[in-house]
Structure formats: C-alpha cells, structure tokens
C-alpha cells in the first residue's frame, strides 16, 4: 500500500489509493486519528475522497505528525524568525521525497540531468532545515554540472554567469524578493540582461517582508519585463508537503499525478466550492504517507478546470482526472509566512 504512488494510472487508482491512505493514517497517525474522532466522523463511512477530513496545517506547529510505524531521520522547518512558532515536518524516508521531486520535475519541465541549476534563495539558504534547499540540492546533484550553484547577494557574479551560459539550458530558482533585488541591481548598474530562450526562471516563495507586497500577476509582469522573457514559471509547495505543483506561466498551477487540490468553502470547511470560485486550498499529497496526506492549508485559491491528462510512461489511452488552479493569497488572520501573497 505504501509503494507505487508514483505509478497511479487511472482516476480509479487515485481514488482507491486516497481511501487506502486515509484508512492507514487514521489507524497509525495519532494526531490525525484524534482529529477525525473529535469531528465525530466514523472512518468506515468514508467511501469517497470528498468525505476525507483534512488536517489543519497548524497541527504541524505543535504536534508530532508522524505515523507510529516510522522513525524520523530528520525534519524540515518552515521559514520565519526563531521567535515564531514554526512548522516541523518530520521525515522518515528522504528517498520518497527525492523520487517525488524528480518525477514531478520530469513531468512538467524535463530531466534534471539536462539542466544547469542556479539558486537565488537568500533566507532559505540560511535555514538548515529548508525543504526548498533540499529540493534544489537534490536537483543539482542529479544535474552534476560544474556550473551549478547558489547565490546570496553576489548579483554581479550571477549576472556574469548568466551571460556566459546563454547557450546552455539553465534553471534559475529564485525567491520573489531576491529576483526583484537582482533586477534592481542590473538597472542601477546599467547592466543589460541578454538572456537566451534556454533560461527558465522558476519563482517561488514570497517577499518575506523584504519588499512591498503585490499581486502574483503584478510580480510576474515585472519579472517578465525585467528578464525579457514571455513566461515566468512558478513552484508551489510548503514545508508540510513532499510534492510540488508547477506553473508554466500565467499563475496557473498543475499538480503531479499523486497530488490534488480541492477548494473548500471558507464558511463551511466540510463543503467545497464550484470550479472558478475562490475558497481555501485543501491538498492531497500521497507522498506524505508517513505524515499526513490530507492537509487543509491557509492559502486561498480556485480551481480553474478539471481535465484528463495521459499518464506518462504508458502506451495505452487510460486517463486520470487532474486540475488547474490558482493561488490567490492567504486567509485573513492566518500567520504571515515566507510564502505569503497579497490576495488578488
């Protein structure tokens, strides 16, 4: 049951795997079982995904979210100051996270071995338990290119390297405020970016209080103009997840095959809104088998459409339901985190 989540082939497979995971986590994850029991829900009556209870993400701040059959190797910790009550996600199998990273990247962008990876991720680089840094480190390792590396505030060095790599396939992972700082540096020093179409910029994170907040669309437009590219990609994940959704432009995200977004009603957390309506994001992440695969986040968003996509690695015509969604901001009064956005 714990294996083969990356080989889900049909919508029936996905639904069955979700229900199996729910039953396993109810039986073996103490904090989740107590939550379900508190809601007075009979687990035997959960026979469809929409009925599965989603654990509030805040539980990762004050509880051990790890099943009783697992032993933690280490943990990821959310961004923030040392005075803040930060989330901890205890990890018992880093191989599961690495496979999720690889297959998700491969599905949406390509094989990591084909790219040079550069990281412009200050603040995250200073967090020894950052899941984002672990992800980029893993992609760098798989790439194996000598040009791979991180940049904190050495903008001139990054500028020169980007010019020298114009003929190479390059991925630049950048936290939002750092990408804006880099563009400010180029402008103030009259440095003109001459980049090739082989550069892919993947924006992630947020302003972290370093810049004036703006809408996602405003941010993407500034980055598009500054870097002279038609599309800015984005990555959406969080400390409490082992999977990532990607946007290939226009602030429209897609989930990998073992991950799904549902949008709940902010007035009634046990019901869901229609596609196109704004609500709070619930996330199914089947890679979280040893923690919790059903998480109610404090992010606002909306599902744009449901669609069928072919499974990679298969020659048949079987399809699986997936969704495109937008992330629109944070619920009022929720904690301000490094990945916060202004509601649009």
Segments and roles (model prediction):
Residues 2-5, 9-24, 28-31, 114, ...:
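Active-site glycine/GP-rich loop and adjacent strand/helix microenvironment
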Residues 11, 16, 27-77, 84-90, ...:
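Active-site diphosphate/adenylate-binding microenvironment
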Residues 75-85, 123, 176, 239-241:
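Ser/Thr-glycine-rich phosphate-binding loops at phosphate-binding pockets of nucleotides
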Residues 79, 88-96, 133-137:
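"Short basic amphipathic alpha-helical interaction patches in structured regions
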Residues 83-91, 113-123, 144-148, 273-274:
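Short acidic, glycine/Ser/Thr-rich loop/turn "cap" segments at secondary-structure junctions
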Residues 86-90, 128-131, 182-185:
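Short, conserved acidic/polar surface loops in the N-terminal third of protein domains
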Residues 90, 94, 98, 121-129, ...:
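Short capping loops/turns at secondary-structure boundaries
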Residues 108-136:
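Conserved AMP-binding loop of ANL adenylate-forming enzymes
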């Amino acid at each position: 049951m714990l294996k083969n989540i990356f080989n889900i082939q049909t919508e029936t497979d996905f639904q069955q795997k979700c229900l199996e995971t729910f039953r396993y986590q109810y039986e073996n994850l103490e904090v989740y079982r107590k939550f379900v029991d508190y809601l007075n829900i009979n687990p035997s009556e959960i026979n469809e995904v929409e009925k599965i209870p989603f654990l509030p993400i805040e539980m990762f701040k004050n509880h051990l979210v790890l099943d009783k059959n697992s032993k933690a190797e280490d943990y990821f910790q959310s961004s923030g100051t040392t005075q803040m009550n930060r989330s901890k996600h205890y990890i018992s199998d880093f191989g599961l996270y690495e496979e999720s990273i690889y297959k998700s990247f491969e599905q949406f962008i390509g094989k990591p071995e084909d790219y040079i990876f550069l990281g412009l991720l200050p603040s995250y680089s200073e967090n020894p338990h950052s899941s984002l840094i672990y992800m980029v480190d893993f992609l760098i390792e798989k790439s194996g290119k000598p040009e791979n590396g991180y940049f904190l505030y050495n903008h001139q060095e990054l500028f020169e390297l980007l010019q020298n790599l114009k003929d190479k396939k390059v991925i630049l992972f950048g936290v939002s405020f750092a990408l804006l700082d880099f563009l400010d540096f180029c402008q103030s020093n009259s440095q003109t970016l001459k980049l090739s179409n082989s550069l892919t910029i993947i924006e992630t994170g947020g302003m972290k209080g370093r810049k004036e907040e703006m809408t996602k669309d405003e941010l993407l437009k500034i980055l598009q103009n500054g870097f002279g590219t038609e599309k800015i990609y984005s990555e959406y994940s969080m400390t409490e997840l082992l999977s990532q959704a990607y946007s290939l432009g226009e602030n429209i995200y897609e989930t990998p095959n073992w991950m799904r977004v549902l949008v709940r009603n902010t007035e009634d957390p046990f019901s869901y809104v229609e596609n196109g309506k704004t609500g709070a994001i619930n996330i199914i992440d089947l890679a979280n088998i040893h923690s919790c695969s059903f998480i109610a986040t404090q992010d606002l968003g909306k599902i744009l459409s449901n669609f069928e996509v072919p499974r990679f690695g298969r020659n048949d015509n079987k399809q699986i339901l997936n969704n495109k969604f937008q992330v629109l901001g944070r619920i009022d009064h929720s904690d301000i985190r490094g990945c916060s956005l202004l509601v649009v």
